[in-house]
């Protein structure tokens, strides 16, 4: 792997050197370089430096320009603009040579690995045992999966944790019913995901009906909770059946979502049972938690309720039971002390923000989250229906995730079939899954995670606008051009002058690495999605204005094929980081 310095970084280094040469006391000053509509880049840092040194900004800018060599391999021209801005134009040769180095690097496209890589534990995709996954589970899974891929690509080590809901009082009801009705759940290995969920739903509804009408059964169910929590083998065996059958279902849904879930990363609430008493004991001994009305709680002066009373975090209830806080705090101890995490990232509903704020502060007070560990709650918004309210079925029920994905694939099949020229029905169905699932993911990921968004399948599978289908068709179009080129191979020709559309495309291709790093560092997959949409848009402009196979000279044909090839590889790599497929033909 040979990392490639981006053009923006190279220009930044040149400007920093010129600033230091002009004003030695300004060593280390930031030129504040950014992309510009007036030139390739604009530097605004001279204004702050002029103010600091009490110099005239335009005169200082002119001095800096005099220190910059233009017409060389990198910078073609520099102009002073406005009150003291620098407008910088990069040489065509530099753009092509830089992109050629990226293409030669293979899959990483010249993007370096971060030097200060740590270990991030990503807590995402947390369904509940014995319950169907619904539209509310979509965002945690899709966002978490994309963030892991992006962090991995930068060089960070990531460990996934699926904190599934596999513990609680509801299992007393379920297990007692199964104990009294043996054989209701088939062995997990004998069924598929749909059958597993059907069985679990049947048992849940039947047990709930008995629980709500039979007081004696209700009492037996409560005793079963005690048996479960005390580790009774017979009870645990039946509980394990529910967990195993639920996993079969989970895997089927995640497979449909085109996500890899590793069994060893499914670590539910139950995994922390043994550690929760110690967590409570340590918090009480340290004085972080105190007894209040029989419960063990943590108070926060700055967090108050409507009556201006402190809102407590309940670690242990008055009856001795443990809640979510004890489980989450025990998980933090495990992830920091045993997994050696330097960052804890939670991809959870924004409505849990207060809970995690209190959990993190408690862990800080206890010393379990030291200065060397960062904990971040990336709360996400709600998926809305067309009416702007939380997405429901027409009957007012929560939308099943499987139904939503199936409909997306079905709608995508209509789009693919309409555009298909030489695809068989099997190929259409294969592409439909890639397009439909990609459309659902992209609609989510192209939205800032903390914002709500409307689930609109018509827009999601549209060929126009900011959709994954638009990106996929751009990729497929490039593959078609490369096939039509036959024996003519892509080749970079730095000696050629570039068309304006070629320059715009080339400069954007060069920004792939910095964009991925920024999106990963800010946990902002929507920034990568926006980059890819702009890339496809710039390619469309290039395609319209710059004939590829009918270019004026053989060298120009090769150079434009080279730009096509690198664009396709960048689209493929970027969309893969978002968990979206790029079909070669559509």
Swiss-Prot record:
It catalyses: tRNA(Arg) + L-arginine + ATP = L-arginyl-tRNA(Arg) + AMP + diphosphate. Monomer. InterPro entries: aa-tRNA-synth_I_CS (IPR001412), Arg-tRNA-ligase (IPR001278), Arg-tRNA-synth_N (IPR005148), Arg-tRNA-synth_N_sf (IPR036695), ArgRS_core (IPR035684), DALR_anticod-bd (IPR008909), Rossmann-like_a/b/a_fold (IPR014729), tRNAsynth_Ia_anticodon-bd (IPR009080). Its EC number is 6.1.1.19. A motif ('HIGH' region) lies at residues 127-137. It is found in: Cytoplasm. One of its GO terms (biological process) is arginyl-tRNA aminoacylation. The gene is argS. One of its GO terms (molecular function) is arginine-tRNA ligase activity. This is Arginine--tRNA ligase. Belongs to the class-I aminoacyl-tRNA synthetase family. Its main location: cytoplasm. GO terms for cellular component: cytoplasm. It comes from the Bacteria. It comes from Streptomyces coelicolor (strain ATCC BAA-471 / A3(2) / M145). The lineage of its organism: Bacteria, Bacillati, Actinomycetota, Actinomycetes, Kitasatosporales. Pfam families: Arg_tRNA_synt_N, DALR_1, tRNA-synt_1d.
């Amino acid at each position: 792997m040979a990392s490639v310095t981006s053009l923006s970084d190279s220009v930044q280094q040149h400007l920093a050197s010129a600033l230091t040469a002009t004003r030695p006391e300004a060593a280390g000053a930031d030129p504040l370089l950014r992309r510009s509509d007036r030139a390739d880049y604009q530097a605004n840092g001279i204004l702050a430096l002029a103010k600091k040194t009490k110099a005239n900004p335009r005169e200082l800018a002119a001095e800096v320009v005099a220190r910059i060599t233009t017409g060389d391999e990198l910078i073609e021209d520099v102009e002073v603009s406005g009150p003291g801005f620098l407008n910088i134009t990069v040489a065509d040769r530099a753009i092509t040579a830089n992109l050629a180095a990226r293409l030669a690097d293979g899959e990483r496209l010249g993007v370096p690995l971060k030097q200060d890589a740590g270990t991030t534990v990503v807590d995402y995709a947390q369904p509940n045992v014995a319950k169907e996954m619904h539209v509310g589970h979509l965002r945690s899974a899709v966002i978490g999966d994309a963030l892991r891929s992006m962090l991995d690509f930068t060089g960070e080590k990531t460990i996934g944790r699926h904190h599934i809901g596999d513990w609680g009082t509801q299992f007393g009801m379920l297990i007692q019913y199964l104990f009294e009705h043996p054989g209701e759940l088939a062995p997990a290995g004998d069924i598929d995901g749909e059958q597993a969920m059907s069985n679990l739903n049947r048992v849940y509804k039947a047990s709930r009906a008995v629980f709500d009408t039979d007081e004696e059964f209700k009492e037996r169910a409560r005793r079963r909770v005690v048996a479960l929590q005390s580790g009774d083998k017979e009870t645990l065996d039946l509980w394990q059946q529910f967990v195993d059958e639920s996993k079969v279902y989970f895997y089927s849904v995640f497979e449909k979502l085109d996500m890899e879930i590793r069994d060893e990363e499914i670590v539910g609430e139950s995994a922390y049972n043994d550690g929760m008493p110690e967590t409570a004991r340590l918090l009480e001994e340290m004085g972080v938690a105190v007894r209040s009305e029989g419960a063990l709680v943590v108070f926060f002066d700055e967090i108050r309720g409507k009556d201006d009373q402190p809102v407590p975090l309940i670690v242990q209830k008055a009856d001795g039971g443990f809640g979510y806080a004890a489980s989450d705090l025990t998980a933090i101890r495990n992830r920091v002390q045993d997994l050696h995490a330097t960052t804890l990232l939670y991809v959870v509903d924004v409505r849990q923000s207060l809970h995690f704020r209190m959990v993190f502060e408690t862990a800080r007070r206890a010393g379990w989250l030291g200065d060397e560990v960062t904990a971040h709650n990336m709360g996400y918004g709600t998926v809305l229906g067309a009416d702007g309210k939380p997405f429901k079925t027409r009957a007012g029920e929560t939308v099943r995730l499987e139904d939503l994905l199936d409909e997306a694939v079905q709608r995508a099949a209509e789009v693919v079939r309409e555009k298909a020229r030489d695809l068989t029905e099997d190929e259409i169905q294969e592409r439909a899954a890639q397009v439909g699932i990609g459309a659902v993911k992209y609609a989510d990921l192209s939205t800032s995670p903390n914002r709500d968004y409307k689930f609109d399948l018509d827009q999601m599978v549209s060929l126009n606008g900011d959709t994954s289908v638009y990106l996929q068709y751009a990729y497929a179009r490039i593959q078609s051009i490369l096939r039509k080129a036959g024996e003519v191979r892509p080749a970079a020709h730095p000696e050629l002058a570039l068309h304006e559309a070629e320059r715009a495309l080339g400069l954007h291709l060069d920004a792939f690495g910095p964009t991925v790093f920024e999106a990963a560092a800010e946990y902002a997959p929507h920034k990568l999605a926006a980059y890819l949409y702009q890339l496809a848009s710039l390619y469309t402009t290039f395609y319209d204005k710059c004939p590829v196979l009918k270019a004026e000279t053989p060298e120009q044909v090769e150079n434009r094929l080279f730009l096509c090839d690198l664009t396709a590889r960048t689209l493929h790599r970027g969309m893969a980081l978002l968990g979206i497929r790029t079909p070669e033909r559509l």
